[in-house]
Each structure stands twice: as C-alpha cells, then as structure tokens.
Amino acid sequence: MTYFPHTPQEIKEMLNTIGLESIEDLFSEIPEEIRQKAKENFKIPASPSEIDLLEEIKNIARKNIGKDYISFLGGGAYKHYIPPFVKLVSLFPTFYTAYTPYQPEISQGVLQSIFEYQSLICDLTGMEVANASLYEAGSGIAEAALMSVRITGKKEVIASSGLNPEYISVLKTYLQAQNIELKIIPLDEKGETDVDFLEKNISPKTSGVIIQNPNFFGVIETKLKDIEELIHKNNALFILSIYPISLGILKPPSEYNVDIVVGEGQSLGIPLGFGGPYLGILATKKEFIRQIPGRIVGETIDLEGERGFVNTLQTREQHIRRAKATSNICTNEALSAISAAVYMAILGKKGIKKIAEVCFSRAHYLRERMQKEVNLEITYPNSHFFNEFVIKIPENSENFLKKLEEKKILGGIPLSRFYKDRDKEILVAVTERNSLEELEYYIKSLKEVLKKN
C-alpha cells in the first residue's frame, strides 16, 4: 500500500465522478458564515522547511527537564537499565507492527514470542497461566476485579489503600458503571494493610480482595498469609498487584496461594513514557483460564506434526457475543510484551535477582543516610521496604522539590498530588540506575536546601 497524496488530476477525476466542481462543494451543506468563521479562527501558517521544523521541535523539547537530571521518581514507573539488545530485537520488522497476529500461518514468530512471554511471566510469578498482555497495571487490576465477580457471582470488591491511587481511580471507573461495590481498607501504623479492619469488613458477599506488594508507599506487606486465609475463608479471590523486579528477592505470589496476579510490566525493559505504552501483566490459576480477559497464545501441533502457535481462548467481544465476552479489551500490548520477554530472557533469574538486590541495598543506604545525616523524618520507619520509601520535610513538598530541580535532581513524587492532607511528604524511589555518586549528591543537595530554610 502506498501513502502518496492524491494528484490534482486524481482529485479532478473523483470530483467529476460525484458531479462536483471543487472540494469546497463537499461542504456546501454547512452555512457560508460558519465556514468563513472557521477559516478565520483556524488560520494555518505556511509549512516551514524541514530544517526550521526540526529546530522548532527542539526548542519546544528544551522546555522539558532533560535526561541529565538525576531521577528518584517511582510510584509505578521506574528508571531501570534497558540492555540495547532489547531494543534491537523489538525493532525487528517482524515484531515492530500494530498488526494483530490473527493469521497463524504467517505469524509464527510473533506468536511464539508472545508464548515465551507468557511462560516467563508464569516462571516469575509461580502462576499456572498468563495472558498475552493488557494495557497497563490500572486496567489489569480492574480486569482482575471483574474476573473475581464473574467467577464468584458476587458484586463486592475490597481494595487496600496501599494500592496505587491511580489504579484505584481506574478501578472505580470500571466498577461503578457495573454497580459493583468497592470498599477501601486503610493502612495500619506500619503502612501495611490493616488486617483487623479487613476482617471486620470482608464477608461472604465479597468477590475479591486486592493488595499491592510492595504497596504504593514502598512498604512490604508482611501479613500476606493471614490475609490469604481471611480471603479464602470467605470464599473470595486473592488478587495481588506486584512490582516484577521485586520478585527477584521476594517470594513469588504462588507461595501465598494468590488467585490472580496483576502488575505493571514497564520495569521489564520498557522505557519511561508519558502516556505509555506500558504493559499490563495478568496471571492466574489454570482453573480460571476461561475467565481471563484478552487472549492467550497456545502451543499446538499442525497437520504435518510440527509444533505451532495460535491465538486461543479469545473470549473477547469482537469474537463472541458481547454478553458472553470476558472483556472488551481489544488490541493488546504485544510489542511491549515481546520487549519484556527479551529483557527477562537476557537477564534470567540471576540477573533479575541481582538488580533487585542492588535496588534494595541502595534504597536502604539512602534512607539510612537521610535519617542519620540529614535528620529527615521517615514515614513508616519500622516497616520493611523494597526500593521506595516516604520522607517528611519541613515545608510544602512541591516547593521543596522545585528547589531540588534547580540542582538537577528529581527528588521524588509529592504525596499531595494524591492526598491533599499529605503536603509535606515525598515518595522516593531508588533503582540500579542511581549510582553511589548520585546518592551522595542527593544527600549533599538535601542538606543545602534544608539549610536555606
């Protein structure tokens, strides 16, 4: 297919065919005064040269904070190192396409890659089956909640307030339109899900309980086994939201008898991007395979006895009746899933464990220095954490962070963005990309900013 614009001759022939003299005649039904007003309001300047256009774009881009800034941002999207090989493979013409592999006879490479992604996610989480991907963690959590409703036949979902607030927002959007009740469970003094409060609010009417580990504040949930027993005692499903890299050192969800695992796959070789594309992970027990949203790539044997791969269990609304469909999830994040598969395959279990250990140790080193040398107060000081923690500062967090930006440091996320009453707290994340020199510079800059106050 070519993408050349129509020539004047072609335009003339098309107009002759429909009995018109000019393109303007196509809009004759719109009153002249409205068309004239539109022309005046939407004056498009003459197109610049390619050189001038590139310079203009560069000037606009300079308004952004550059890549040379030291970043301690997290909250669901993290700056991890991406091996060049991941991008190299992802840009293969076979993979770098928006085409959905509906024709298995010409799509074996893509289908096998997605199959490998599913297998690697199962290895990482310990679950029995994973789907071919979802959009991102927020919609993945909402889809998991809907799965629990379909499986149990009950219409009440409980979520911990340790869940990323943006995920909770997406969850509310999905559930309220279907008249599914959502209860939010608070955290205890250690920043973990309040198990006593959960016990008082869960009931036989509950379809599923959603916990995030580590939670939005970086805290590791240490009572997952107690939570699991409480959930299954009430015949509900246990839904766990994960940070994939943390599984390098934390127990896999399967060891807590989790029913559905969801998570954001951006940390698995996918670059940071405002608006994505990211990757929604969803894995579950085999008994729930027919309630999985989206699609699964399965392995089969063709007529010649050769191994092959096909899309299977596509219970989506464009394949079957909408009333019978498990989801209206359409195009998946296949390219992101392939990137994640390449990343996991390159690093292997030892590599992911090493990255997790570095994130863990450097985050603990930074927090300890902040406590002892900068005298910053730590929110949830007695909790266990992976690579994120919350600090308290003596002034408005957004103003404080702007002062750090002047030193080319993105110091963290102000919690006031999500919680109005927490305007003096900052969520700080550390990854393997943060060198010891950067940690030292952050400590030095904190001292200087606090000294000026």
Swiss-Prot record:
EC number: 1.4.4.2
UniProt keyword Oxidoreductase present: yes
Pfam family of the protein (one): GDC-P
Signal peptide span: none
GO molecular function: glycine dehydrogenase (decarboxylating) activity
Record key words, sorted: Oxidoreductase
Self-association state and partner proteins as the record states: The glycine cleavage system is composed of four proteins: P, T, L and H. In this organism, the P 'protein' is a heterodimer of two subunits.
HAMAP family: GcvPA (MF_00712)
Known function: The glycine cleavage system catalyzes the degradation of glycine. The P protein binds the alpha-amino group of glycine through its pyridoxal phosphate cofactor; CO(2) is released and the remaining methylamine moiety is then transferred to the lipoamide cofactor of the H protein.
Family as reported in the entry's similarity comment: Belongs to the GcvP family. N-terminal subunit subfamily.
The protein, known as: Probable glycine dehydrogenase (decarboxylating) subunit 1
Gene of this entry: gcvPA
